[in-house]
Every structure is written in structure tokens, then in C-alpha cells.
């Protein structure tokens, strides 16, 4: 097995030549076997790596995070020349090692070996968090099934200096204080001793590592998604979507910002210790309309035309004081993977139902509510058309094609003159407000 790994390293190093200007190595297995011959300097690097393998090492690529290759390229020193970072495990003594090779006079030279312990290397990230022009290496070590430890290393004269670290379940790297450089947020699930915590790790220009933390909502069981984005007053923030038990719902979003020099959860309410205004049962937070601010979705039950319940989704944006305002409303059709941004004057006046009686057609009907007990006046249908007759079905009189995705065609038809019933709608509005869905908006998705 070791001999096979040594053979495969030759095309892998050729990949380094092909994409050395693009940052971290990303290459498919098929591409490994279709690369040109490599230069002598990469053959020398291969010899260095084979030497490590000959000592009983095995490749140990990170199991998570954005960079998951066993051999990676990254300009750590900021001189425009990529260093090579390679990840190994030594089963005999259980050591995990990260080797750094630098180009010197046309040859790769081993400049540093970072040694850690654990069952695996969970993740690696490279970013300049103190603004000195060089990138720190942030390595996550998988200590056990439930425990991970992060170590932050500065590269000084091509040697790694351990600055500090902390335990975590989920890591988020983003500019939280708005200084133009990334910060580290370590998120920890509840333990028997403490509740869930978000910890800010900030590296000062003088090399001092500063930490501050804030409570997350009581009742968290898993963290499903972490997003970095802006609040409506311009503050950068980290949005932590979690699943658990929060009274009236199973999903909550904690909104963490830097205030008065420390990390603060501005959405948390007392005495419950829960971000109550964000609790719901569906959907992750998102910049749903690509306007620049992250919104929190709160489902609202629509007046029913049948026993099947349907919801509109009200999307709320927050400011740095934790106050929210309604930004927009959508209707999401999860089964057919589309959503529609609803005009404000549809609020409280529109109901929906499904019509799936025609083969190859899945239809949602929007109706104006004449009175609380009905009747309903249909004014819009949106169809998802599939099967051999999809194109013909999309060309029926009155139907207007919105888009296509794979073998599916999405179309709509207006059933009443535009802007009837005092509602805002016409062909252009439906075209502009229709969107396809993506799975990461659903609860529990990454």
C-alpha cells in the first residue's frame, strides 16, 4: 500500500505545477492521471515526501473544513511563492505531523514539522489574522469523537510558533470586528458543567492572543450552520443556527457581535436564556434576497383551504442591539424546490393550495381571501412540469415559462387581470420574484 502511495505522488506533484498560482490544491482523481511530466524540483519534493512515508507514515488529510487534501499549496510567508504543506499520521507512536516545505534555490527544503496528538487532523485553515502580511495556520485536532482542539501557529522565519488554542465543536473564520482581518469563533456545545458558548479568538498586531466568550441559547443539541454577514446597522456578525429544544420550536439563531471589546450574543433574552425572537421549526438563516444582510426566517401559518397547512416565511433582519424588523416574506415550496417573494400587500389576504391531479404537473394555486370563511378567488398558478410532455405542457395557452432545472420546467399563469383584488401582481413581478431553492436553507443542512 505504501508503494502505491509513492507512485501516486508523482501525478499529484504535477498537479502542484498546474495550479500553483491558485492557492490550496484542489484536483480530481481523473485529473491526477492526465497531467504532464513534472520538473526536477517537484521530483525532489517527491523524494522528501517518500522519505517521510518510508518512516512508517501514512497520509492523513484533514477530515473536515475547506481544505481536505493530503498535500496542499499555500503562500504562508506572503512572498508570492507557495509553500507545500503535507499531512501525515504515524501509527506506531500515534503522532500526527504537518510538514512544511519551502522552495530554496530551486529545491524544496523541509523547514518545519508541527506535531500534534489525537485520532485525526480535523481541519486546517490559513489566514492572516493579525495583519502582518503572513498567514497563520489554524489546525484542528480530533481528540475524541466529541472533543476537538484548535491550535494557532504563526509562521516566523519559516518556523511555526504556537500562539495558543482552545476546544471547539464548530469553527467559524470571518472578520467579526470589521478591521479587514479574519477572527476565529470557536463554538462549543453544552457540557455538564457549562452551557453552549461562542468564544472569540483575536490575534493582536503585537502577537497577543485575546479571547472573549458569550453564552448561546439554552437547549442547544447540535449546531447546524454558521454564517457570517451584516446586520441592518452595518455591524458584522456571526449567525449560529442550532437545533434543540427551545420551547415553541426546534431551531434557534444566536447572533454574535463584538461590542465594547468583547463578543456579545445580542439576540439572547432573559430569563429564558434563549434567542426567543428567532425560534422556529424550519429553515436556516440566510441572505435570502442577496441584499447584503443575513435574515432569520419565521414561518407564519396561512389561512387554510384544506386540511394541509401552508406557511409564509417572514424574514427578519436584526441590528446590533438585538432589535428586528421585517424585511420580506416568501412562500417556499420545498417539494418542488422553488420559492416566491411575496409583495407586502399579500400579507393576510392570500391563501394557497396544491393541485397535483394532472400527470407530470405539480401546481401551487395562490388565492385571494374574500372573507375569513371563503370564498377564494384564484389569481396565480405556478407549475413544476416534468416527464416527456413537460415542454408541451409549458406551451399551453396562458402559461409563461420561468426557468428550467435539469428535466424540470417551471411555468406560471395568471388567472385574473393584473393587480386584481387590490393585490400587486403582474407578469414581470412573478418573473422577478421567483427563485429556485437550495438545500442549505432547510433546517439541519450545512
Show which residues each predicted segment covers.
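Eukaryotic low-complexity, acidic/Ser/Thr/Pro-rich regulatory regions of large signaling scaffolds
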Residues: 421-424
